[in-house]
């Protein structure tokens, strides 16, 4: 009698739920579920999402029954849905859904049933609840038997058995899950797989969101069971909102002897949230771009300065770093990857490395990328191992099988990996990411597992120099503790230094103080700012991506421009500063990256070829040094940067102006000037010796240093008190009086002569260490000024004299002895010194013997022939 009554109650509930699904209304705010069922069938889905708020308005008893007694109300609701589907399904159009099971999922306001893993209590058992958290683990998808059919060869009969346990939503009472292998007479049974029913089954772990965990406490976790169509809907790292039934099961380790039980959540609906806090309900981190957004994107792309607008709008709270922000924008856009028919893969992702002084906002730029990119994973050098970045072989705690555990770079496939403190990573761990950064795969051959995983991600890393602070007097490779094999894999290497500049420091301090004085709108001064965390009680109400399709018309257009803010518009009193809204920038980047695939035209290809050949073959000028080696990867870098710049313009063709913009950024990142310290030691020696030294000579030397190479080729100015003499490069007919006047003027400022064998040699302060090579040669030729002849005649005389000059053996021995002592001094701290510095230091030694420039050249060439030193291009190298 009780079973008949329960059956009647079940049928009555099925009838009421079916009436609810079939009811019609004129209210535009109420969902018509017959249309929703048709959309579900056309999309090939098997789960209808029902708004529990609308069900509460229709019948309060049904809504309360679903929340408080899901075991009794969910199964009749599923049965009612299957009855409605049977009347609407088309066997021709929906042939793939024939004989499939359909389910009902719930969304809406759950009230006090909206909890998190920390607030779950015993009173929530067997209730319908809603949970928010981060997925930390996903198991393999395995089949679970629901109904098995067995055949007995001895009796020629079929045996049938249904299975039900605590992890199933069915209305059957819990039965034994023992799999039969023989009948009651002991005859063996063989399973008929064609008549049996299996269901996909997966378990995941949901962890409490770290920003919601109390201070000083670890986030808590709970196991979630996914069945049938819900499997593989999430991956580790996703922020999700899961609706389901909170169940208690037997103890997993000690059977039924323990009074404590294992609890799980049987999922009913899974809503993907944004991968970052504060982004709202955005499935899988992908933003929902509306038609209005596309119109605004195309309108903005027609602006000539769209690239500058986008780069300026990135991290507006960070002052300066124009080129670095442009490079980060290109990294977010990415190039175009190539997969050739012969199996070759050419990556399209851009890698960036920032090396520089502490407190230069490197980590803040990484955090901005982490919060802006749709998929980004952050890690640190010390906190990451090689297997943690790539993949590790672990043991499954449920089955004991060996399985692969994906690392950070595999999880960030099609995303960005942010690595801070890159220089602190050990060499063994750093080698593990070589393959990822170029081939973009992870090859594993461990514990009997041999496989290759995709890791198509961009890498942006920050590192500190070897000495803690960047030494501008040393070459870049002496400051960066990374091998060339690693540096060549980074497309751009930026050296960020903390330069001392009064104007820049004042602007920076004003910018930082504005940030500290910033007060959110609606907050009274003096009150603490508390994070509301945007708690979402209406589950799935704003998500239209595969979960709720009823509110598509209610989408709000994303604003394009940022409203005026004293924080973001700092230092913009006189010039109008335009900033784009960061949410609109996210949509613009997502649209350009997914929709635009530019191609190279012939003119751009030739221009890029010329740039690459020029970078490879041109000599470095003056004190310039390369930050990273120039290899064939540099050519691919130019192509990737040009393609990304074309994407920023939403152009389908990479034009020459894109290549010019890429060249500008690459040259900024590639070349670094090395400043050699001024040698003041010899000046002090001359002062101690009692010789006069005019301080105005420092000013004249400084002025000469600041002059550009082009100006020094055409004009050189020498200041001495009130006298200024200008010598043009094409002056060939100066008078002898003017030459004598120049000589006397220089004598009055320089202070000392050293008489050689053929002409008068001036002793100049060392300024050539900071001059470019071409300027150094010009300046050195200016030192040999003959007081009795013109410049042109002096040059010809010096050339003829150099060819006939000879050096006695005694004088050669003195020169070699003096040079041997100099090679051990500070002059050769860089393993080389210019000819002028060497000659000046040799002649400054207190002795009667002096050397002219021509004699020094003859002596150096003879020592070079004896392999004692190397002399080339007026530079002496120590061996």
Curated annotation (Swiss-Prot):
Subcellular location(s) of the protein: Nucleus
Keywords linked to the UniProt accession: ATP-binding, DNA replication, DNA-binding, Helicase, Hydrolase, Nucleotide-binding, Nucleus
Gene Ontology molecular function: ATP binding; ATP hydrolysis activity; DNA replication origin binding; helicase activity; single-stranded DNA binding
GO CC annotation terms, alphabetical: chromatin; cytosol; DNA replication preinitiation complex; MCM complex; nuclear pre-replicative complex; nuclear replication fork; nucleus
Chain residue ranges for the region called Disordered: 679-778
Chain ranges of the MCM domain: 306-513
Enzyme Commission identifier(s): 3.6.4.12
PROSITE patterns in the record: MCM_1, MCM_2
Catalyzed reaction equations: ATP + H2O = ADP + phosphate + H(+)
InterPro entries per UniProt: AAA+_ATPase (IPR003593), MCM (IPR031327), Mcm3 (IPR008046), MCM_CS (IPR018525), MCM_dom (IPR001208), MCM_lid (IPR041562), MCM_N (IPR027925), MCM_OB (IPR033762)
Biased composition (Low complexity): 732-752
Chain location of the short sequence motif Arginine finger per the record: 488-491
One BP annotation, GO: double-strand break repair via break-induced replication
Database matches in Pfam families: MCM (PF00493), MCM_lid (PF17855), MCM_N (PF14551), MCM_OB (PF17207), WH_MCM3_C (PF23191)
Broad class of where this protein is predominantly found: nucleus
Alphabetized CDD domains for the sequence: MCM3
Keyword Nucleus: yes
UniProt keyword Hydrolase, yes or no: yes
Sequence ranges of Acidic residues compositional bias: 690-713
Positions with biased composition (Polar residues): 754-778
Residues that bind ATP: 356-363
Function: Acts as a component of the mcm2-7 complex (mcm complex) which is the putative replicative helicase essential for 'once per cell cycle' DNA replication initiation and elongation in eukaryotic cells. The active ATPase sites in the mcm2-7 ring are formed through the interaction surfaces of two neighboring subunits such that a critical structure of a conserved arginine finger motif is provided in trans relative to the ATP-binding site of the Walker A box of the adjacent subunit. The six ATPase active sites, however, are likely to contribute differentially to the complex helicase activity.
Sequence similarity: Belongs to the MCM family.
Assembly description: Component of the mcm2-7 complex. The complex forms a toroidal hexameric ring with the proposed subunit order mcm2-mcm6-mcm4-mcm7-mcm3-mcm5. The heterodimers of mcm4/mcm6 and mcm3/mcm5 interact with mcm2 and mcm7.
Protein name: DNA replication licensing factor mcm3
Protein species of origin: Schizosaccharomyces pombe (strain 972 / ATCC 24843) (Fission yeast)
């Amino acid at each position: 009698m009780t079973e008949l009554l329960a059956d009647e109650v079940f049928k009555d509930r099925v009838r009421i739920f079916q009436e609810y699904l079939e009811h019609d209304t004129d209210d535009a705010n109420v969902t018509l579920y017959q249309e929703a069922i048709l959309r579900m069938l056309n999309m090939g889905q098997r789960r209808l999402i029902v708004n529990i708020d609308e069900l509460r308005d229709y019948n309060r008893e049904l809504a309360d029954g679903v929340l408080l007694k899901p075991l009794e109300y969910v199964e009749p609701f599923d049965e009612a849905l299957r009855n409605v589907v049977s009347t609407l399904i088309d066997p021709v159009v929906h042939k793939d859904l024939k004989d499939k099971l359909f389910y009902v999922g719930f969304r809406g306001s759950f009230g006090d049933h909206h909890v998190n893993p920390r607030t779950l209590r015993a009173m929530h058992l067997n209730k319908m609840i809603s949970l928010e958290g981060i997925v930390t683990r996903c198991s393999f998808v395995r089949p679970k038997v629901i109904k098995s059919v067995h055949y007995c060869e001895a009796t020629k009969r079929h045996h049938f058995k249904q299975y039900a346990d605590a992890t199933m939503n069915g209305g059957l009472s819990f039965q034994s899950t023992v799999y039969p292998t023989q009948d009651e007479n002991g005859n063996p049974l063989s399973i008929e797989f064609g008549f049996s029913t299996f269901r996909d089954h997966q378990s995941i772990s949901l962890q409490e969101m770290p920003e919601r965990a109390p201070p000083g406490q670890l986030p808590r976790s709970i196991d979630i069971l996914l069945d049938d169509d819900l499997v593989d809907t999430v991956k580790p790292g996703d922020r999700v909102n899961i609706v389901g039934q909170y169940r208690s099961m037997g103890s997993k380790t000690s059977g039924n002897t323990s009074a404590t039980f294992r609890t799980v959540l049987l999922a009913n609906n899974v809503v993907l949230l944004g991968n970052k806090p504060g982004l709202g309900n955005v499935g899988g981190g992908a933003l929902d771009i509306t038609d209005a957004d596309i119109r605004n994107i195309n309108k903005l792309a027609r602006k000539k300065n769209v690239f500058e607008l986008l780069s300026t709008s990135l991290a507006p709270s960070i002052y300066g770093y124009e080129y670095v922000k442009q490079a980060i924008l290109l990294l977010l856009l990415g190039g175009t990857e190539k997969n050739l028919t012969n199996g070759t893969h050419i990556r399209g992702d851009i890698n960036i490395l920032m090396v520089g002084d502490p407190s230069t906002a490197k980590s803040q730029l990484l955090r901005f990328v982490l919060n802006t990119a749709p998929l980004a994973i952050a890690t640190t050098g010390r906190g990451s191992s090689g297997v943690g970045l790539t993949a590790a072989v672990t043991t499954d705690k449920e089955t004991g099988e060996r399985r692969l555990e994906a690392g950070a770079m595999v999880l960030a496939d099609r995303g960005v990996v942010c690595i801070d403190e890159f220089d602190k990573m050990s060499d063994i761990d750093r080698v593990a990411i070589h393959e990822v950064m170029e081939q973009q795969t992870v090859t594993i051959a461990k514990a009997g597992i041999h496989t290759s995983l995709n890791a198509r991600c961009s890498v942006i890393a920050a590192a500190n120099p070897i000495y803690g602070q960047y030494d501008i007097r040393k070459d870049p490779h002496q400051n960066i503790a990374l091998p060339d094999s690693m540096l060549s894999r980074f497309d751009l290497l930026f050296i960020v230094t903390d330069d001392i500049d009064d104007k820049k420091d004042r602007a920076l301090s004003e910018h930082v103080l504005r940030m500290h004085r910033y007060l959110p709108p609606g907050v009274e001064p003096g009150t603490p700012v508390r994070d509301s965390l945007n708690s979402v009680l209406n589950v799935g109400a704003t998500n239209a991506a595969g979960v709720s399709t009823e509110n598509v018309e209610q989408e709000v257009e994303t604003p394009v421009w940022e409203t005026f803010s004293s924080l973001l518009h700092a230092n913009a009193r006189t010039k109008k500063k335009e900033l784009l809204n960061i949410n609109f920038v996210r949509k613009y980047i997502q649209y350009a990256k997914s929709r635009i695939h530019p191609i190279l035209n012939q003119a751009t290809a030739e221009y890029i070829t010329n740039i690459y050949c020029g970078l490879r073959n041109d000599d470095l000028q003056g004190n310039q040094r390369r930050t990273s080696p120039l290899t064939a990867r540099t050519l691919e870098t130019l192509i990737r940067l040009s393609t990304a710049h074309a994407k920023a313009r939403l152009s389908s063709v990479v034009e020459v102006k894109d290549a010019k913009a890429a060249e500008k950024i690459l040259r900024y990142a590639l070349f670094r000037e090395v400043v050699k310290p001024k040698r003041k030691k010899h000046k002090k020696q001359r002062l101690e010796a009692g010789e006069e030294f005019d301080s105005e000579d420092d000013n004249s030397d400084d002025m000469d240093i600041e002059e550009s190479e082009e100006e020094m080729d055409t004009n050189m100015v020498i200041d001495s008190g009130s006298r200024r003499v200008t010598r043009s490069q094409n002056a060939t007919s100066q008078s002898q009086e003017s030459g004598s006047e120049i000589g006397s003027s220089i004598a009055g400022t320089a202070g000392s002569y050293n008489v050689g064998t053929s002409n008068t040699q001036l002793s100049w302060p060392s300024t050539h260490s900071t001059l470019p090579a071409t300027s150094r040669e010009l300046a050195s030729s200016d030192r040999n000024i003959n007081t009795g002849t013109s410049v042109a005649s002096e040059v010809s005389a010096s050339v003829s004299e150099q060819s006939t000059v000879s050096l006695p053996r005694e004088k050669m021995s003195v020169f070699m002895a003096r040079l041997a002592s100099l090679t051990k001094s500070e002059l050769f701290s860089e393993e080389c010194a210019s000819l002028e510095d060497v000659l000046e230091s040799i002649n400054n030694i207190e002795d009667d013997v002096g050397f002219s420039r021509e004699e020094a050249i003859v002596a150096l060439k003879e020592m070079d022939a004896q392999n004692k030193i190397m002399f080339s291009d007026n530079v002496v190298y120590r061996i």
